[in-house]
Amino acid sequence: FTTSQIKGSSCIVEYFEPLASTGLGMFTITGLGHAYRFVGEAKAQDCEVDVNCVPEGTGQTAQRDGAVRISVKEGTLLGWCSGSLINNRAQDCKAYYLTAFHCGVNASTADFTAWKFYFKYQRSGCDSGAASTGSSVTGCVKRGDSNDGGGNTGSDFLLLEGEDAIPTSYNPYWYGWDANNTNPGSGVRCIHHPNGDEKKISTVNTIQSSSAWNGIQAQTHWRVTWAGTTNGWGVTEGGSSGSSIYNSSGLIVGTLTGGGSYCNSVQPNGQLQPDYYGKLSYHWESNGGPASDDLKNFLDPNNTGLKVMTGSYGPCGTLGMDDADGFEAPGVSPNPADGQVNITLPEGLKDASRIDVLDLSGRLVVSMRIGTDNTKL
């Protein structure tokens, strides 16, 4: 068990035991993290954008609900990282958290039991409203990693499984993902906790298909630059490490290793500098470590070979997808097909603006916007 931050220079620990066991109980405080100033007052840089700002956060509610702040412990060191709750093809509601390996490259099994995952740590408005630390779970075990020293020679991923189920009151969202090595193009975003602060959102300007974190492995990372938006110019900071970038369909395609972006008030022209995200396609099975550590073993446990997975608020529910009540699937004919197909949308999807067509391997075949007649394409 680990507490959240306690404000002040002293605290009282109370222990209650059954009357029949009076004086027999014992407990040990294994460690104490002390900050010389209240770390809750540490704030992100001034150009960052709150996740509930409009228009930046509009339509990003699910991805917001799947992003977590992580209190990390490595020996005597404490710090912040970001991460994402991620779905798997078994859709069994396992509490898998995807983050960066460098966040815990030296963490022991005992250290991981003290890691704390905060949901819903965000302002209710745009630069307004208080954030609560009350929605958290403690403890995890390591499942897989990039075996690269924290990005030295690979894509820098760490997959953890929470020791406890996530309370439904947290309204957790399990992110979907795309493990194809395809440039996600436009509409890419990142939700993160810079400097351990309330949840922020950053909007991608450009994304380079292949890059490297340290110049050794050229195919491991996406090189990203950020765009100015209505309410700021979202960048990344310490504490953002491990956060995901996701494509226009809301699917994770990479996790943050680091980079050179800053608000201009901190470093002139810092908002134009790039950051680097380890590719989920490289996490999949390309890092060269033990095959048992590959991400695909956990996200595709039944070895279907499919590389695209949708996100869900309840993956182990009856249908295992968002808003499943009364769901009607789009009509596709002929199916299978090797040429032209007709797609008919049910009433529940009449407001859809785009259609993505995937083949049986999960590869994106075509993506198109729906025309003026939005019931048939």
What are these model-derived regions, one by one?
Residues 5-224, 238:
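Serine endopeptidase catalytic core focused on the charge-relay Asp
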Residues 1-3, 376-377:
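Exposed aromatic-hydrophobic patches
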Residues 84-92, 233-256:
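Catalytic nucleophile loop of clan PA
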